[in-house]
Amino acid sequence: MYKPICGLARDGLPIIGVFALATLVFALLRWPCLATISLLSTIFSFNFFRDPDRTSPTENGIAVSPADGVVCKLGEAADPITGEMRQVVCVFMNVFNVHVNRSPVTGVVSEVRYIPGKFFNASLDKASTDNERNVIVVTDAEGARFTVVQIAGLIARRIVCPAKAGDTLSRGERYGMIKFGSRLDVYLPHGYHPAVAMGQKTMAGVTVLAKKAD
């Protein structure tokens, strides 16, 4: 759905192109300081928009992390769609993480909702309710609903989500990204429990985020 181009997130290509072109222009004009700054920006953009292939685990009854980052919150919170209290796992992404987001499970996108908001630091609790965010609900073959929320942060003000209601996603499949660092919240369906700890590093599409209770 959201396939990379030459190992890079497609939404990053225009930004990389602008910095690369600026580097060339400044070099031709013999403006070394600006050429150096543009070159460093190009290198940073290449690193930021990298989108490596991942192999997801195949065992049943699990959900994988939708984002690279660090687990910044575990607990209960109201599902932004239904209002039900659910177990929630929050993953904070900094500017050095891969920022492409992946589906935690195989299922059908049953709902997509964009919610405008503010741009507080994404590590704050109020970011879940006050910040700009995009919500998708992925319903698996057993009817379990996973609510995944992309949250814009203090720096990241650009949420990308081409997924739409009716689309089918595979576990670990790319479905969007948030530019320049932010946060992903996953509201687990009843019967699933977190399989990660506070402060644990996660890898999108690989780290087992939650497991179904026996």
Swiss-Prot record:
MF terms (GO), sorted A to Z: phosphatidylserine decarboxylase activity
Cofactor needs: pyruvate
Broad class of the protein's primary localization: membrane
Coiled-coil parts of chain: none
Subunit relationships: Heterodimer of a large membrane-associated beta subunit and a small pyruvoyl-containing alpha subunit.
A Pfam short name: PS_Dcarbxylase
Membrane-protein topology: Peripheral membrane protein
Post-translational modification remark: Is synthesized initially as an inactive proenzyme. Formation of the active enzyme involves a self-maturation process in which the active site pyruvoyl group is generated from an internal serine residue via an autocatalytic post-translational modification. Two non-identical subunits are generated from the proenzyme in this reaction, and the pyruvate is formed at the N-terminus of the alpha chain, which is derived from the carboxyl end of the proenzyme.
Keywords tagged on the record: Cell membrane, Decarboxylase, Lipid biosynthesis, Lipid metabolism, Lyase, Membrane, Phospholipid biosynthesis, Phospholipid metabolism, Pyruvate, Zymogen
Name used for this protein in its record: Phosphatidylserine decarboxylase proenzyme
GO biological process: one example: phosphatidylethanolamine biosynthetic process
Cofactor note: Binds 1 pyruvoyl group covalently per subunit.
GO cellular component, one term: plasma membrane
Metabolic or biological pathway, per its Swiss-Prot or TrEMBL entry: Phospholipid metabolism; phosphatidylethanolamine biosynthesis; phosphatidylethanolamine from CDP-diacylglycerol: step 2/2
Active site: residue positions: S182 (schiff-base intermediate with substrate)
EC number(s) on file: 4.1.1.65
Signal peptide interval: none
Subcellular location: Cell membrane
Family annotation (HAMAP family): PS_decarb_PSD_A
Catalytic activity: a 1,2-diacyl-sn-glycero-3-phospho-L-serine + H(+) = a 1,2-diacyl-sn-glycero-3-phosphoethanolamine + CO2
